[in-house]
Amino acid sequence: VDIPQIGVDALEGILGTRATLLDVRESGDYAASRITGTQHIPLADLPDRMDEIPSDQSVYVICTKGGRSLAAVDFLLHQGLTAINVIGGTAAWIESGRPVETGEPT
């Protein structure tokens, strides 16, 4: 299966549209820094929390650098969802100077 992928430049233009940005990192990483508006489901929890992911819109999946998100996208595609991997992950987002939220999510 070819995994659809997108870079952080293109992702910025999609944020705020009818799309879901799913962060699959562990809770500690997510609390340390995250893109505003992300939905958080750790990769290991994904199979048990599928009902939390909208099936009627594209799901952009992000992690720290792109490894876990690649596995998550592969899983979501096999579940029949439209899923896209974010190349470079949160690290690329931060390196490009874009803003993040920090601290425990409210």
Regions found by a protein language model. Give the residues of each.
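Short, surface-exposed ligand- or partner-binding patches at beta-edge/loop junctions that are enriched
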Residues: 61-62
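Rhodanese-like catalytic fold shared by cysteine-dependent sulfurtransferases
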Residues: 1-20, 26-58, 67-106
